[in-house]
Amino acid sequence: MKVKLLLTAITLSCLAIDVLAQVSISGKIVSADTNEPVVGANIRIDQSLSGCTTNDKGEFSISNLPDGKHVLRITHVSYTPKSITTKGGEKNLLIKLQDSFTNIGQVVVTGTGTHHRMTDSPVPVSVITAKDLSNASVTSLDEALQKLTPSFSSMTNGMGTTLSLNGLPDDYFIFLENGKRLYGDDTYARINVAKIKRIEILNGASSALYGTNAIGGVINIITDDVKNAINVSSDTRYASKGRFTQSVNIDVNTGKFGSYTSYRRQQAEGWQLNPYEENSKTHELEETGKVASTGFYANTVNQKFTFDATDKLSFYARGGYYDNKTRRPYEAYDYNILHETFNYGIGAQYMINKGNYITADCYADHFSSSYCFFKDNKTYNGKAGEEQVRKRTRNHNLSIKGIFKLGNRHKLSVGTEYIVDVLKSQTDNIAKEDAYTLALFAQDEIKLLRNLQALIGVRYIYHENFKNHATPNVALMYKPGKFNFRASYAAGFRTPTLSELYATDIAKKNDRLTIGNLDLKPEKNNYFSLSAEYVHERFSVSVNAFYNNIRDMIDYNTIATGDKAMEQYGHKEVRQRDNIAEAKVHGINVSANAYLGAGFNLSGGYTHLTVSYTHLRAHETL
């Protein structure tokens, strides 16, 4: 009993000492040139997970810190990064930041999975900042990427907008939100632009770090979790064709606990390019109500809770809901299309010491696509007023990652990932199909010399259907003075989706049946790039040349036509997904940015692509 009482007393004493040892740091950040407050500056404590952002008066406060010296690292897109050392719980700090006329101090994480200033990353990463988004007055992520990055292009049809990156469709690159992969359809439509802090864009294969599908590039959306006590914002935009966007954000932070809530409403009217279309039988023009861009309404709700147990251990839980329903003209269509997504996840991060930390994340994404009939439809046997679920997908992801600084020359990233994909489809007669993927990855960032660094990584993948595969990547960076020279190679890997393996599809405009193929093989690629960059305080210019060779591309192979197709399949044309193509994409990206003075910036970019697409064998028809 005495021993128990003694242990209890010691424990309570330690807790009391720990409470008494907690200190706070507060102050104000201003411009060194104008003494005006700097709003939205990010302050992070070195060797800690604690941090905050400045309010509209440039003020900040960070509490629950252990007593002793602390290094504050301050960053802002318009200012040069700065670090200062404080002693204990200092109050009323006045920190002055120097103006930065270009984004040379921007911190990025996508290229290597670890934090680097953009000019110090061995893998080239381009950045779109919140300031860029505001200046461009964009309301959606796809609009932002098209306006602000020449590597992106889009195609709009009656079903919506699809993006391409360096000539490759969105099946070949992935979207991340704060480093967490987004699954399912409508990935970029779910992002609330009002919450974006920056967008990091990695061109080229990165399967070693980010897994399957990342053979064309990675887009990482970093959102802004404000650390002020209370932050409420609202943004309303209206444009032609009834395009309306309303965003509301409510953030509450009490020190250890944080709540971040966002809601966005989008809607638009449909529009036509031509009120006439050609009759497929008579080849004569006739009036049509079909649209080039479909009207829609969409709602996005996201909620995130955080808990900072200590300055080295933090937890989060998050969830979200998204829906998008078309508004198609009654005279031209039989049904609307409804997409719904809900997702949830939990995670934790523990900082062992400076440069060493472990993260664990568990995430799930549920997506469904449905036909909402307002007329009877023979193709899908739909009745007016009915709703028919076309497809349901579920993605479950569990990942653990550790980053360890080994001496002064090595930074090692290791981790594992387990993914389960599930597909159900009423219209495709798929009761349930699923597959799992297990991955192990390792990457080492090596400082060879003062101005020379290398990166070597590999991912091992075991897929339930496609077994073993490995994807390596290598990068080298030489940095003499204000110049940066980079060279890289990466192998990519894309497994066929469950829809490509199992799903069937009936075309809406002609009598054509598309069927799955259980004999599909993974698509593979080799990506090479060379880049040169010059960075000055007032201007920067970069040139990047690349070559991407994709093998075993999945395309459509016509297997039956005419009477034989009708006899065997009941349709005039039948095609099957198959590995029948090879694509070679090579090109050059040029970008430049200059500060002209008096608050004026001039920036521009140019992308030149050459794409060759070869069918490996002729169509086989019955």
Name each region found by the language model.
Residues 325, 366-370, 429-431, 464-469, ...:
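Surface-exposed extracellular loop regions of Gram-negative outer-membrane beta-barrel proteins
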Residues 227-229, 237, 252-337:
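Periplasmic-side early beta-strands and strand-to-turn transitions of outer-membrane beta-barrels
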Residues 30-34, 41-46, 73-79, 87-134, ...:
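Short, acidic, small-residue-rich periplasmic hinge/interaction motif at the N-terminus
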Residues 61-64, 153, 180-205:
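Short acidic/polar hinge/loop motifs at secondary-structure boundaries
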Residues 306-324, 339-466, 472-479, 539-546, ...:
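Face-selective signature of the C-terminal outer-membrane beta-barrel domain
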Residues 90-96, 141-144, 148, 161-164, ...:
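N-terminal periplasmic accessory domains that precede
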Residues 125, 142-180:
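Extracytoplasmic beta-strand/coil segments of soluble accessory domains associated
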Residues 408, 447-451, 547-549, 569-617:
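Gram-negative outer-membrane beta-barrel transporters
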